[in-house]
């Protein structure tokens, strides 16, 4: 009897949206994460679920009963946890050593809050750098969810055939990536990367997701038509899409991963309207999208798909395809046909990147010169795990060598180092302050007459405010 084709649904959760007031985080936990987990529990569905460590931490603080439900589903095997950086930072835009630390911190958070350490990894915004497979492997991951659209656009043949090029400013390609599917639909040499696990040269297993499937499902969840089409995406269209992919799986592989998108679209509108229509509408209630997500799962199973998870498809697919072609993916690209530099070039990134970099370098040098202290470890963790505003506050309160220099003033009201949200320094969906290497100083530690480090004073001077 032939095996059923497998299908992976992986909502990915990130509570640190820049336009989400921290006071509303519990609301998101209750109106998005809770109904998703209850749907899985009550329907006996199997899915993967990715969340940043900070998202899990907020769940524990703001909605512990929602976290308890997640923990129960993870431990019972209904949900496979998928790990990522502790905060939703684009790894392609920061130094590898910082990325490695935050990846391990994210894994620690999953283990702390659910009792399970993920084997599969997620790369925020699918921002690409060639060192990422080594980074994830060193952090302890066995597999990584990859962006197929970036991979396919690295083939000149596909770029020429589709006429697509990377958008260096935003997500304008998101609704046009179906052109990739139109080109590869009868080409098994390309399809096989979407329907089989593959392995990076270092042995890291990879599974690929694509907007050609995720985008129609997203529009279906939202039930939206605003200016893009006359009617919402229908259940029949979703069914036809899954039927087409079922025949492609039969010809080329064993599974597909059609939904690896924001979990917050289940139960809320999240960023849908600002991304698609540039409308200032954020996190509106969308309770009908919960029922539509259930319909996606039910449609898949009615067509003969088996709901599965990343680790299961890898375990059951046989030897992975050896895939050294990932080395031709251009550094700096991201999902939706965009680029990581679109995030790195935002106003807040350019403003705060040098501040973050100088603070990091100063603390790292102090660690080296003092032989390491717990307070310094805590300061580094604060900087790489929360945001520049909180990092400044934490470091300023440290005893000993990290006391605030007497001739450095405190930030005054109105300065744009905000403490309203812990996503201000490191933007969640799109990092506002990222270490892109724009600041360099051979010795970031400057000492005055008091022999106290002038790291923070120098940081403020660089912004023209000291």
Model regions: which residues?
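Acidic, His- and aromatic-enriched active-site or binding-groove loops in soluble protein domains
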Residues: 66-83, 104, 137-192, 287
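Short, surface-exposed basic-aromatic patches at helix termini and helix-loop junctions that form
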Residues: 130-145, 295-303
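Short, well-structured secondary-structure segments
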Residues: 4-95, 102, 119-123, 142-147, ...
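Generic structural signal for well-ordered alpha-helices
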Residues: 33, 37, 67-71, 100-110, ...
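A short acidic (Asp/Glu
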Residues: 19-21, 58-63, 93-95, 128-137, ...
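The substrate-binding groove and active-site-proximal loops of carbohydrate-active enzymes
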Residues: 17-28, 52-60, 85-99, 117-124, ...
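Active-site and substrate-binding clefts of carbohydrate-active enzymes
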Residues: 2-31, 166, 180-181, 194-212, ...
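CE4/NodB-like, metal-dependent polysaccharide N-deacetylase domain
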Residues: 98-125, 136, 245-251, 255-259
